[in-house]
Amino acid sequence: EVRRRMNELVHELEPQLPFSNEVVRYNVSAAGIFNEATVDQKEKLCGKIYPWKQTRLVGDSVAGFQAATLGKPGVLVICGTGTSIIAGNLDSEFTHRGGWGPLLDDVGSAYWIAVKAIRAAIDDFEGTGPKTAITSTLCEWYEIKNIQGIVPIIYHPEFNRAKFAILASRLDKALGNTDDVYQGICREAGTEVGKLTIHTVEKSGLDISPMPVFFSGGVLLFNRRAQKAFEETLRERFQVMLSQPRLPTVLGSTMLALREAGVEITDKLVDQLNSTYRNVDELTKG
């Protein structure tokens, strides 16, 4: 399906190019790839669609980094449904941590928070942990007699990681200001993401002060306790400059292609890309 859509995109784009113009760079980003794709990965996804020598396949976090930092040294921390951190040093070398997915524990992510919350409710029910309003809240939402009833719900194939992330968001709105146990889970999430960020920076050899740290994803954007703990953890180790990405993640591959084609990345170009993306986004939503 991915190959089919990519093929359609190329054939739709080429006739729209101004006369005598041609595509000189193809950049594709995909989940499940750490940094640069292997030859085998590139062949399976891009083979016979794009000119081989003009094509680059990278992980979606690499594209996200380009969109966030415009290719300059810095750190991108993505903490939403999953957690992924990438640091780019002065030599344009990348160090990537996280991004393993829910089964291998994306620490601090919305999925991680939801699982921790359910576990806290189980501990409350079994008497092995503190009392928490998480228990009664889950029972009310899922119309179950006690927390044991949540087992068939969360193990159902349709209860995917996105639904765990939605659950974390709902819990934050309901209990974020009132329940000590839930608040502790959120603080732990932010602290753990902060620690992983510090480790990533130290492994990358990036040495800039203040350290440019770009953050995105629902946990760091909307969960106030997680965000505060994340920032405090970072500031204990580095002088940091926190901000949101300069461009939407989806434009990261565009940034890579422009840079590799020798196009100068100016503020005017960045504003133009942002404007074009917003206009297209509004058209598709309309």
Task: Give the ranges of each region predicted by the language model.
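Membrane helical hairpin/interfacial module
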Residues: 9, 30-33
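Glycine-/small-residue-rich active-site loops that bind phosphorylated ligands and cofactors
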Residues: 33-35, 221-222
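Phosphate-binding/catalytic loop of phosphoryl-transfer enzymes
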Residues: 34-136, 274, 278-286
